[in-house]
Amino acid sequence: MTKKYVVALDQGTTSSRAIIFDHDANIVSVSQREFTQIYPQAGWVEHDPMEIWASQSSTLIEVIARSGIHASEIASIGITNQRETTVIWDKQTGKPVYNAIVWQCRRSSEICEELKSQGLEAYIRDTTGLLLDPYFSGTKIKWILDNVSGVRERAERGELLFGTIDTWLVWKLTEGKVHVTDPTNASRTLLFNIHTQSWDKRILEALTIPESLLPQVKPSSAVYGKTRIAGEGGEISIAGIAGDQQSALFGQLCTEPGMAKNTYGTGCFLLMNTGEKAVKSNHGLLTTIAIGAKGEVNYALEGSVFMGGATIQWLRDELGLIRDAQDTEYFASRVESTNGVYLVPAFVGLGAPYWDPSARGALVGLTRGSNRNHIIRAALEAIAYQSRDLLDAMAKDSGVELKKLKVDGGAVANDFLMQFQADITSVEVQRPAVTETTAMGAAFLAGLAVGFWDSTSELKHRADIDKSFMPSISEEQKDELYAGWQKAVSQTING
């Protein structure tokens, strides 16, 4: 049969999805399943790797069955994933030795402090482009090796494998035949030299991590292996891998230096492509690996906010202020302002540009007149304020004053948030017609690897803009609002 489709597996922090795209990059079918969030104690976040696999494999089977497409019509599968989340498993049985430690988890803070005391902070920053923070995989691996009975001994005997979620899924899809990752995911481990594009022996020694645990690093657009899980029709090539944020950057076709996007998901992630130059940040951002127009390694500046959409989940699940995330736009629009209320959602510390794991959330400026609408509006505004923090830092590091910001992720459907983002940054915010840019990036990579598409120039017609949001408030208003935010943040950092 003719190859007519590409499948993207989008393994996120709260759900696993499978999306089928046709040759025009239109969405044909979608399947999604949520999975359990595990919070063993304050600041700890885990997932069950087997539940992730069950949810992801079932969506793949379901999306093909639901669409009526024959597996033989699928050219390839691309994978995009929550980054940094850490899985270690037995290479013979395939059984994880512990739950996956999620990117949000802060349990390895003491390990980070220990590395700082050894004087390794500058070396790690220069080599990996990352900060010494519990966010990244390296210290999570060490925590498992040091704290789960018998695991270090098994690792040193070569019995175990490590992977971020992309690696885990490829290993499962290929029935244990393939242990790989790509440069975008490798660059988030704290173990990868982004300049030589290889695992760094000095950091591995400092963390006492056996190199035998680590996957082979292959290009983001390449055939890694085949899977038989998708039903009748033979094997399907697995041909694209990218961490979720780099995948979104590629899906938005930000393949040239100076192009940037912000993804509004569980967290918020602002990335700017810097081309072949790895720009070192002096303002709390990360230097990471991105993907160029031909699938080659590019570099990017990245700012990460831990609590984006997760802040809205908190309003719903813990406070009961809303029934659905979509309700926030209605409630926020019922008041002219927050009336001085600011929410700083530092529930698991603060990410870029502050990097303070000890910061805790705060709701400030409350008066007797403060109500549900003010708090909900403050939660939405907090997402935009945190993104403004990143944008300011990026401009200082890169020397580029952004005029346009491409956006994607679930929260971009919220017109109130998008307009406030434009207002508080004085930047035009562009929402694409197809907002599934993270999955689309994985599909593009997988399709390009097998010749389903010839080049990214063939894909540029998919970059249509649904709506542009232009700044609409005065500089004075903007500065006053942002000063209030900065004051609120300072209270969470300084106690």
Swiss-Prot record:
Function: Key enzyme in the regulation of glycerol uptake and metabolism. Catalyzes the phosphorylation of glycerol to yield sn-glycerol 3-phosphate.
Organism: Shewanella woodyi (strain ATCC 51908 / MS32)
Protein name in UniProt: Glycerol kinase
Family annotation (Pfam families): FGGY_C, FGGY_N
UniProt family annotation: Belongs to the FGGY kinase family.
UniProt-listed GO biological process terms: glycerol catabolic process; glycerol metabolic process; glycerol-3-phosphate metabolic process
Reactions catalysed according to its record: glycerol + ATP = sn-glycerol 3-phosphate + ADP + H(+)
Activity control note: Inhibited by fructose 1,6-bisphosphate (FBP).
Positions of ATP binding: 13-15, 266, 309, 313, 410
MF-aspect GO terms: ATP binding; glycerol kinase activity
Keyword Cell cycle included in the entry's annotation: no
Membrane-spanning intervals of the chain: none
Residues involved in glycerol binding: 83-84, 135, 244-245
Name of the gene: glpK
Binding-site list for ADP: 13, 17, 266, 309, 410, 414
InterPro entries: ATPase_NBD, Carb_kinase_FGGY, Carb_kinase_FGGY_CS, FGGY_C, FGGY_N, Glycerol_kin
Annotated sn-glycerol 3-phosphate binding sites: 13, 83-84, 135, 244
